[in-house]
């Protein structure tokens, strides 16, 4: 019931269309219900009279019915067009809400959830929700009107024959309720299994170069086939439930005709019913059964739609871990001093400490470098500054302001990030550079490209800055992609910079180009650099050696070599 209440609120912006839609549905149903009763009345009164009287009455009857069917046709058009558009607009609204929520959710959510499942919720689930949004209330309303209306007429025609019909309807409702619960479980399982297929497909397509380079196509096919077979098994269980549901309802519908024929014949034989009334009874049984068949189909649609809506709610009702505090203020006039005060951190789903009582300061415009083994917490330290995660204990401050007391937008707009995992969007080189400042002029984009040492390469391309980079920048080399990402940060022009192993995946020649760009980028900015190649950080104002959840050593390059500890050992190994 709570799910239905939440679903109904999405009708609110379209309540006028919704109520007109229901009014049109009422008119359609009323005309369908009125015709057999009109025919019964005419058969017993007018058509039993003189031929001349019958012929003279046909003209007004024809005009009246023609007007009624024209009105019904107009109502059907409105229900079909406006009703579907209402569902499509609700789907649009939900898709926007879901996408906006994906944009708000914290890194911890993406650490624990699969993007294939998220895509399934954004596309497949919302399509089923849209179908339910339009057809659900309309079909339910029409069906109820026809069922109730036809039953009233059945009682009016012959009460004795209506009693066994009522008993059959009650038995059918009890049967349908039991089958519905089973179908709901199988539809939810279907959703999960199709999400698994999407996940498997996305993994394979995103990593197709790795798959083919290792000649592991067969392994990926086997993984996909397992997901595909699991979906088939889930569908099998679903269709078994549907088969029982639909065949059971068809049996009860057949019983209604059987009872009408046998019990009606018995009543006619005993003079308690006229043969013409039995014919009308059969017509109303047809009108009664038709909406039942619609409700049977609606049950499948409702289970799909509500299952999708529950999955939709799972996302939109998830509270992001990282949000603006109630008293958050914008970060202004940034100088760039950074301070980590007794910082400890562990992930929300794991109590194992990643950082323990880490403290250091970076004066504005100065640079520090973080070195240490993989998994020691270097990237985690950097992730706490723009609040990709929040500290468990202690605080991180910029210009003396606790980052948790600042608005996320103002904080992150002052921090530039260049990482080894470069992500370029499917578009042009110009679009990707301009991502750092969406309203940038062409001159600003070119200037940023020149500073990143990528302008000359771009000008050699046939389409220059309008060159399409391919999905994730597949048409460019690693070094070219990295320089575009650096140009993006030049354009953003932040006072604080994070360089997360920005050259670790590059060859020596590309690294020299990139290193020159990075040095230009870091000039007069507060910079945190993570590097495995120690030659790239020798000139840092301070180097921190991160190990065992904390800072094991700190000092300049020369001081750490003189200390002859962990850093000195790393340096010797790198030579």
Task: Label every PLM stretch briefly.
Residues 13, 17-27, 65-68, 138-189, ...:
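Transmembrane helices of ABC transporter permease
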Residues 64-72, 76, 169-173, 242-256, ...:
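Hydrophobic alpha-helical segments in the permease module
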Residues 193, 216, 240, 288-315:
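Cytosolic ends of transmembrane helices, especially the final helix of ABC transmembrane type-1 domains
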């Amino acid at each position: 019931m709570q799910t239905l209440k939440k679903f109904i609120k999405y009708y609110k912006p379209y309540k006028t269309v919704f109520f007109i839609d229901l009014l049109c549905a009422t008119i359609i149903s009323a005309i369908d219900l009125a015709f057999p009763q009109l025919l019964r009345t005419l058969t017993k009164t007018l058509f039993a009279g003189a031929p001349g009287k019958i012929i003279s009455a046909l003209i007004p009857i024809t005009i009246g019915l023609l007007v009624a069917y024209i009105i019904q046709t107009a109502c059907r058009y409105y229900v079909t067009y406006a009703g579907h558009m209402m569902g499509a607009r609700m789907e649009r609204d939900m898709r926007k809400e879901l996408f906006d929520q994906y944009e708000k959710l914290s890194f911890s959510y993406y650490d624990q959830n699969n993007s294939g499942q998220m895509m399934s919720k954004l596309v497949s689930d919302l399509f089923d929700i849209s179908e339910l949004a339009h057809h659900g209330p309309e079909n339910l309303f029409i069906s109820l009107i026809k069922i109730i209306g036809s039953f009233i007429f059945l009682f009016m025609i012959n009460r004795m024959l209506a009693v066994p019909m009522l008993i059959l309807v009650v038995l059918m409702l009890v049967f349908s309720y039991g089958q519905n619960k089973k179908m709901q479980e199988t539809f939810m399982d279907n959703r999960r299994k199709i999400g698994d297929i999407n996940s498997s497909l996305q993994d394979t397509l995103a990593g197709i170069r790795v798959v083919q380079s290792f000649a592991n196509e067969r392994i990926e096919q086997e993984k996909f086939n397992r997901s595909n077979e699991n979906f088939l098994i889930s569908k099998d269980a679903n269709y078994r439930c549907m088969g029982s549901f639909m065949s059971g309802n068809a049996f009860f519908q057949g019983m209604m005709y059987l009872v009408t024929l046998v019990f009606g014949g018995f009543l006619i034989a005993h003079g308690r019913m006229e043969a013409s009334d039995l014919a009308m009874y059969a017509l109303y049984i047809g009108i009664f059964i038709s909406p039942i068949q619609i409700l049977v189909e609606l049950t499948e649609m409702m289970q799909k739609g509500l299952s999708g809506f529950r999955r939709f709610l799972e996302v939109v009702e998830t509270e992001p871990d990282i949000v603006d505090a109630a008293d958050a203020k914008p970060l202004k006039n940034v100088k760039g001093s950074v301070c980590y005060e007794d910082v400890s951190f562990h992930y929300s789903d794991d109590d194992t400490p990643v950082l323990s009582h880490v403290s250091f300061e970076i004066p504005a415009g100065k640079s520090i470098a973080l070195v240490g083994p993989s998994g020691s917490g270097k990237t985690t330290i950097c992730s706490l500054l723009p609040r990709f995660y929040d500290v468990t204990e202690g605080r991180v401050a910029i210009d003396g302001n606790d980052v948790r007391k600042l608005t996320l937008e103002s904080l992150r707009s002052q921090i530039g990030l260049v990482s080894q995992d470069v992500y370029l969007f499917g578009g042009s080189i110009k679009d990707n550079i301009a991502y750092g400042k969406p309203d940038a002029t062409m001159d600003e984009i070119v200037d940023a490209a020149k500073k990143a040492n990528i302008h000359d390469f771009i000008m050699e391309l046939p389409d220059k800055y309008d060159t399409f980079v391919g999905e994730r920048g597949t048409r460019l080399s690693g070094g070219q992609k990295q320089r575009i990402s650096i140009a993006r940060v030049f354009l953003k022009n932040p006072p604080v910079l994070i360089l997360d192993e920005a050259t670790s995946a590059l060859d020596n020649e590309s690294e020299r180009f990139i290193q020159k760009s990075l040095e230009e980028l870091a000039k007069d900015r507060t910079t945190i650099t993570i590097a495995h190649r120690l030659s790239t950080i020798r000139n840092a104002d301070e180097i921190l050696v991160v190990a065992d959840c904390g800072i094991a050593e700190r000092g300049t390059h020369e001081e750490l070599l003189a200390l002859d500890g962990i850093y000195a050992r790393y340096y010797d190994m790198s030579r």
